[in-house]
UniProtKB/Swiss-Prot annotation:
Gene Ontology molecular-function annotations: sodium:proton antiporter activity
Protein name per UniProt: Na(+)/H(+) antiporter NhaA
Coarse class of the protein's main subcellular location: membrane
Cellular localisation: Cell inner membrane
Catalysed reactions, semicolon-separated: Na(+)(in) + 2 H(+)(out) = Na(+)(out) + 2 H(+)(in)
A Gene Ontology term for the protein's cellular component: plasma membrane
Keyword terms: Antiport, Cell inner membrane, Cell membrane, Ion transport, Membrane, Sodium, Sodium transport, Transmembrane, Transmembrane helix, Transport
Gene: nhaA
General function of this protein: Na(+)/H(+) antiporter that extrudes sodium in exchange for external protons.
Length: 455
């Protein structure tokens, strides 16, 4: 009987490469790491924009980049391609997260969804009101939505830093709240920051949607086949005047949550073909052609083991967390502090409004709405979640960062107001993260003390 090949029997270089790859994959899926990478990218942008090399920072993002086909050439700055094209992939992942939660997650049942929905609503309304109280001028008031967003990567990353003592239901509550926040942010962008819409673009976007539906109806499961329809939707939304990144949300919400039906279950196909291949002592060059069909079946079965929404989201997660979002932070967090005139057009009120709304408004809205729903008897706190945990969620929800900066870019045409709003986002998100870490450490200590007392 042949001895099973162990990893140690592999050539040393291959063994080391496989171990390194496995370690890297585990490292990249640690939630706290993506938040740290994002923070480093933002810090680099800030330092660069306030260094003697600040001009090179601005020159880089205004570098023209064009795509062309024949006589057609479309040229835009590198900043545009990051904010309007690459961020579509981020919104694609957001759309798929929403799709999954509606199908089988926290948003799949009304009784489970109502409390995080109420908390998210409070976390949108109260910060917006605080901002508007300080910014009554029409130009500055246009930024009311900037502090309403939550950066899910940062918030979950900070929660992960607090360790395994955090109750699982608390993490689920934060994820549900952040995803609902994403839904609200997408709706806000679509309805309030899309400007005058050109109807001609809707026909192009509709063509892309029809292409997606058509591919799904004929059973095309390869994600690559949907790149072209996605690009058509993106172009259509760009022509309409809506923000083209919404194409990612549309495509994400259309991603199937069930695998393509097969005559055999994928696991049965894998078992059958594996047995067939084992039955051959060796595969000669002449037999290679006969293996083409089994190999195709193996690839299809392996692909359909997971639903498309899970498969694509899992594949894109590292690229978004360690590529798209840090690049967005690098391109947009570089605010020249010395170049901001906080008293021109009362820009300091925009900065103060955003900062206070994130640090004070978010926890006040989240905790207040949750308390109201529980007090009225319409909801109960999830098992294992205390009011201290809800306060922690409220503080972490104040980390607006990526989405808040994104909305600020859409809200303010004035460069000085935009810079002031970005400063408010950076300062407010940093304070919210520090308060969340501080309160979270105290909360975890109390949980451990309580657990120890019961043992």
């Amino acid at each position: 009987m042949d001895r099973q090949t162990s990893p140690r029997d592999l050539p040393r270089a291959q063994f080391l490469a496989e171990r390194a790859l496995t370690t890297l994959e585990r490292f990249l899926h640690v939630e706290a790491v993506s938040g740290i990478v994002l923070l480093v990218a933002a810090a680099v942008a800030l330092i660069w924009a306030n260094s003697p090399f600040a001009q090179s920072y601005h020159d880089l993002w205004h570098l023209p980049l064009s795509i062309g086909l024949g006589t057609f050439v479309y040229a835009q700055s590198l900043h545009f391609w990051v904010n309007d094209a690459l961020m579509t992939v981020f919104f694609l992942v957001v759309g798929m997260e929403i799709r999954r939660e509606i199908h089988e997650g926290a948003l799949s049942k009304l009784d489970q969804a109502i409390l995080p929905v109420a908390a998210a609503a409070g976390g949108v309304i109260v910060p917006a009101l605080i901002y508007l109280v300080l910014n009554t001028d029409m130009v500055r008031a246009h930024g009311w939505a900037v502090p309403t967003a939550t950066d899910i990567a940062f918030a979950v990353g900070v929660l992960a830093l607090l360790g395994r003592s955090i109750p699982g239901n608390l993490r689920v509550f934060l994820l549900a709240l952040a995803i609902i926040d994403d839904v609200v942010a997408v709706l806000i962008i679509a309805f309030f920051y899309s400007g005058g819409l050109d109807p001609s673009g809707f026909a192009i976007a509709a063509l892309g949607v029809v292409m997606v539906v058509g591919l799904q109806r004929i059973g095309v499961g390869s994600a690559y086949a949907y790149v072209l329809p996605g690009a058509v939707i993106w172009v259509g939304l760009l022509v309409t005047g809506a923000h083209p990144t919404l194409a990612g949300v549309v495509l994400g919400l259309m991603t199937p949550v069930m695998s393509i039906p097969m005559r055999e279950q994928p696991i049965d196909v894998l078992s059958r073909i594996s047995e067939e291949l084992r039955s051959h002592d060796a595969v000669s060059t002449k037999d290679a052609r006969r293996l083409a069909h089994p190999r195709r079946q193996l690839r299809l079965a392996n692909r359909e083991m997971l639903p498309p929404v899970v498969r694509v989201q899992t594949a894109l997660h590292p690229w978004v967390a360690y590529g798209v979002m840090p690049l967005f932070a690098l391109a947009n967090a570089g605010v020249s502090v010395g170049g901001v005139n906080l008293f021109a057009g009362e820009a300091h009120l925009a900065m103060l409004g955003v900062g206070l709304a994130l640090v004070v408004g978010k926890p006040l809205g989240v905790v207040g709405a949750t308390w109201f729903m529980v007090r009225m008897g319409w909801c109960r706190l999830p098992p294992g979640v205390s009011w201290g945990g809800i306060l922690l969620i409220g503080l972490l929800a104040g980390i607006g960062f990526t989405m808040s900066i994104f909305i600020a870019i859409l809200a303010f045409a004035d460069e000085n107001l935009l810079a002031a709003a970005k400063l408010g986002v950076l300062l407010g998100s940093s304070v919210a993260a520090l308060l969340g870490l501080g309160w979270g450490a105290l909360y975890v200590r109390r949980l451990r003390a309580r657990t120890g007392a019961h043992d």
